[in-house]
Structures are given as C-alpha cells and as structure tokens.
C-alpha cells in the first residue's frame, strides 16, 4: 500500500542526504511530504512561529507516517521537536533513520547524532515511557534503507493503526 509519508530533517545540514533518500523513495512509487525547495523554506522560516507551526501542520495533513532523518545535529532542534510532537499527537506512525553514514554532496559522512526520540516521553499506566522505546530507529546505510524503508514505513503505520 502506498503511504503518504512526512520526512523531518535538519534542512541546512542534511538536505542533500534527505534528497537522496527521497529520490530513492519516490522511484518506488511512493508519496512524500515535508520536502520543499530552499526558496520555499527561506520564505517560511522568516515567518512568526505560529505561522511556521501552521505550515508544518499543513504538510502533515494526509500523512500516516513521519520519518525523522537523524543527522549529526537533528536532535533538539526546535522544528524537529515540533514535527515529532505534532506527528505523535496526530497518531502518525514514527520511525527514525540515521543518515550520518550516507555521503553528502562532497562525498563525506558525518558523526552519528543523538536519537531525538530520547528527548520525549509519554505516560502509560502511570509510568514515564521514552518515545525512543516506542519508535524504532534504523541506519540508512547499515540497514539497507534503499531496500527496506518501505517495510519500515509500513510497520510504523500498522503499529499506529493506520
């Protein structure tokens, strides 16, 4: 089943890597959201926070899964955090994919970043549960994301009841 998927990533550092992943995704007859050109993002980020939140919320409409592309500096970023919390509240399936081993436009890899799901928790049965214990993470290179991302997304959607 084709899924409409929102991709969350650190735009200035990981845009090229994200674009490579997106291109592999759409060549497999999939739909993606959360990808936009640099001109669009430059315009959006000039707006007030409430307008940026509204724009992100609009990007999430119609999606069933959110994939957080985890680079060296993804965790803790304001808009990444907003996209994670909004996706969780919306009931989207979530997963993370480490992209540090994916080469950038200069052929370089980067250091592994912190799992952004470690910064968030929910309460279940009176107990604090980290999102990192709920949502899986994978490595794009080491776990063969090109071949397996569709399966990961489908599993996340099913886990979320989508």
Residue ranges and their predicted role:
Residues 59-85, 93-103:
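Conserved beta-strand-loop-alpha-helix hinge of the TIR/SEFIR fold
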Residues 12-14, 101-104:
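Conserved nucleotide-binding/hydrolysis micro-motifs of P-loop NTPases
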Residues 4-6, 105-162:
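C-terminal interaction surface of TIR/SEFIR-family domains
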Residues 17-18, 78-79, 106:
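Short glycine-/acidic-enriched loop or helix-start segments at secondary-structure transitions
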Residues 88:
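Anion (oxyanion) recognition and catalysis
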Residues 36-38, 97, 132-134:
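Conserved beta-strand termini and adjacent loop/short-helix elements that scaffold enzyme active sites
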Residues 20-23, 81-84, 109-111:
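Short, glycine/charged-enriched secondary-structure capping and boundary segments
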Residues 1-62, 145-162:
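Conserved N-terminal substructure of TIR/SEFIR domains
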């Amino acid at each position: 089943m084709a899924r409409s998927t929102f991709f969350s990533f650190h735009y200035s550092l990981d845009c090229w890597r994200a674009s490579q992943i997106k291109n592999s995704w759409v060549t497999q007859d999939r739909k993606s959201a959360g990808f936009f050109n640099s001109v669009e993002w430059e315009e959006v980020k000039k707006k007030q926070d409430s307008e940026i939140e509204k724009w992100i919320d609009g990007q999430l409409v119609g999606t069933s899964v959110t994939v957080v592309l985890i680079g060296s500096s993804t965790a803790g970023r304001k808009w990444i955090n907003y996209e994670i919390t909004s996706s969780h509240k919306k009931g989207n399936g979530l997963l993370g994919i480490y992209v540090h081993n994916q080469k950038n436009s200069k052929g370089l890899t980067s250091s592994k970043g912190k799992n952004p799901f470690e910064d968030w928790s929910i309460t279940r049965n009176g107990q604090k549960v980290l999102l990192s214990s709920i949502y899986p993470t994978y490595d794009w290179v080491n776990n063969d994301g090109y071949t397996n991302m569709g399966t990961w997304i489908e599993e996340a959607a099913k886990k979320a009841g989508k």
